């Protein structure tokens, strides 16, 4: 069973990726976008379409020595130079990457500024989704790169360098380029045995009904000041993309008060669950410090995952005022099958400082799932530019992060 540390299909739909709060990305280079016209599964995918520029997104990792991942990629126009799809920056030594050969249209492994592996057997075509599985291993004195394209393995490529650690994963090129590249269905693990992760997709689950509140009177309210309980909570925090038009706020101190929402069930055709990531969009009335908490559970809060703060150790939600949204995310503990996915709930509130009021803008759970090879992902894998050849070759979506160039 895959043990992810980060996953995304970009299903939160934030059109302009942001580092606000660190919940989505930690570093962004250039102006990538998240769009809905071309995707592998679900409703959204990342687009990297620089014009003589570098567009890359980075997600920090907790200094692992092995990074395993899967992503889906699709070129709408070719890279003009040899450039990365995904790479990992290391604490010492040279970075490890998987790049496209701009001449042959094939992928190859690369140790930055040092050496390149042979081209993969697969010649890529435009407007076609491919699955990239990869493993970067810097745990010993021999660094190793393994990868597959649609299940066809490349020869392992190695380099003698001291054991080190990885700081992040980067998706996108490190060199200035003009191209159009789509990325979807990213899963990242730090467990060597998870390679290859294989075919899959991503679905967004949103709050679909109210649970059992302890909202108090004039404590947990909607954006209009109506008490939660007198009005529904779930439909105030279930927008994609996130919107501050509606939200839940805590208007008075109440460390035991909260609003509870239940997420909808997974509907995508799948054979297993890889994992789930809870995402919070939040802000505050002003930027003066305050408190709040967001927790999620798959067993009615016998256990919980802290998305941001918890009922006893609340977190500051005052990063920005209502003109800006901020994001936190966490991998949901022990969400591993349909039973746990379909039981997901969230609670928001618990504040001991409501000056200014904390605002819960939106909640979403991204669920990564397994599909049987040869079965299409659930939704909308066809776009206006697809050809019959592209459709027959289609599969489903994976990821990577650094600041130097190669």
Residue ranges, per PLM feature:
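Intrinsically disordered, compositionally biased repeat/linker segments
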Residues: 205, 209-222, 227-232, 245, ...
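Short, aromatic/His-centered strand-loop micro-motif at the edge of beta-sheets
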Residues: 110-131
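A short beta-strand element within beta-rich, extracytoplasmic domains
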Residues: 69-73, 262-264, 268-286, 346, ...
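Secretory/extracellular carbohydrate-interaction modules
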Residues: 47-107
């Amino acid at each position: 069973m895959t043990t992810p540390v980060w996953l995304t299909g970009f299903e939160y739909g934030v059109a302009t990726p942001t580092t606000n709060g660190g919940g989505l990305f930690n570093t962004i280079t250039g102006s990538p976008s998240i769009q809905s016209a071309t995707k592998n599964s679900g409703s959204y995918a990342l687009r990297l379409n620089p014009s003589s520029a570098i567009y890359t997104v980075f997600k920090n990792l907790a200094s692992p020595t092995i990074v395993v991942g899967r992503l889906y990629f699709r070129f709408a126009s070719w890279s003009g130079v040899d450039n990365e799809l995904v790479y990992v920056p290391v604490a010492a030594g040279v970075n490890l990457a998987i790049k496209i050969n701009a001449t042959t249209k094939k992928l190859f492994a690369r140790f930055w500024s040092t050496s390149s592996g042979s081209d993969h057997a697969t010649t890529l075509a435009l407007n076609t989704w491919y699955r990239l599985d990869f493993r970067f291993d810097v745990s010993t004195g021999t660094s190793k790169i393994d990868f597959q394209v649609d299940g066809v393995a490349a020869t392992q490529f190695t380099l003698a360098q001291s054991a080190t650690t990885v700081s992040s994963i980067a998706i996108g090129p490190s060199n200035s380029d003009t191209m159009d590249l789509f990325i979807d269905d990213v899963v990242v693990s730090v467990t060597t045995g998870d390679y290859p992760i294989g075919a899959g997709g991503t679905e967004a689950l949103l709050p679909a009904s109210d649970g059992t509140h302890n909202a108090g009177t004039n404590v947990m309210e909607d954006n209009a000041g109506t008490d939660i309980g007198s009005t529904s909570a779930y439909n105030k925090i279930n927008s994609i993309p996130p919107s501050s038009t509606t939200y839940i706020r805590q208007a008075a101190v109440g460390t035991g008060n909260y609003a509870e929402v239940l997420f909808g069930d997974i509907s995508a055709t799948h054979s297993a669950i890889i994992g789930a990531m809870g995402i919070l969009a939040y802000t505050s009335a002003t930027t003066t410090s305050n408190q709040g908490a967001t927790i999620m559970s798959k067993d009615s809060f016998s256990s919980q995952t802290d998305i941001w703060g918890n009922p006893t150790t609340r977190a500051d939600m005052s990063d920005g005022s209502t003109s800006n949204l901020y994001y936190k995310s966490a991998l949901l503990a022990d969400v591993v099958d349909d039973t746990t996915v379909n039981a997901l709930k969230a609670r928001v509130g618990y504040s001991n400082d409501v000056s200014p009021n904390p605002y819960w803008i939106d909640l979403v759970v991204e669920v990564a799932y397994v599909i049987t090879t040869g079965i299409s992902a659930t939704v909308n894998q066809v776009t206006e530019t697809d050809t019959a050849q592209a459709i027959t070759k289609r599969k489903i979506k994976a990821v990577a992060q650094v600041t130097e160039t190669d």
